[in-house]
Amino acid sequence: DVLIFSCYIWNIEYVRELAAEFHKLRPEVPIWVGGPEVSFETERFLKENPAITGIMMGEGERTLTELCTSFEQESSLEKIDGISYRRGDGTVVVQPLRSLLPMDELPFCYANLQDFEHRIIYYESSRGCPFSCSYCLSSVDKKLRFRSLPLVYRELQFFIDAKVPQVKFVDRTFNCRHEHAMGIWNYIKEHDNGITNFH
């Protein structure tokens, strides 16, 4: 068993408390976290939260897959980039950051879902932000990446065909590339099924 949390500004305190309580009940179960609230200053976060075993830094798609494989095979964590973890003796190891995947290589995680009747789907056609707002974590890395429009169209059509009631775009700066945003909106307009609402 392993317990894994995604940490954001709105849930980080709950995750800290829950991890500490869970660790009291099941100290043998590793607890891992990831997300924007824990990807920076990982050594400090681990020292302040002794119940947490490790942190996935940055984007988690490839890291989580490798981490789960490591747990299944009971292999060393030392070959996994993008993690920070506590060894059995308490020392903290910080592995090198993982390079960002091209957007088209990120998995489409909805293909195997069947029942969409009461679901809200969160979808990203891009990641990153070109701006430098001092209060926002997005300003740390100004890389802006896009899924190719043909791939986005195929994925949107999947939602339309499945009659998903609500699809929410979670792109940080959806309209910063005009042709990308307009391509998506035109596709949605031309393929409207009268059921799927895109937000």
Q: What do the PLM-derived regions correspond to, one by one?
A:
Residues S76-E78, S99, F116, N193:
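A generic structural signal for short, non-catalytic loop/turn and secondary-structure boundary residues
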Residues F40, V92, L101, K142, ...:
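Flexible, glycine-rich phosphate/dinucleotide-binding loops
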Residues D104-H199:
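Radical SAM [4Fe-4S] cluster-binding motif and immediate context
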Residues L97-M103:
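A short, sequence-level motif marking secondary-structure junctions
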Residues V2-L97:
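Glycine-rich beta-alpha loop elements in corrinoid/cobalamin-binding modules
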Residues Y8-I9, P36, L100, G128, ...:
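Short, surface-exposed acidic/glycine-rich loop or hinge patches that mediate macromolecular interfaces
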Residues E41-E43, E48, I80, R86, ...:
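Surface-exposed loop/turn and secondary-structure junction residues enriched for glycine/proline
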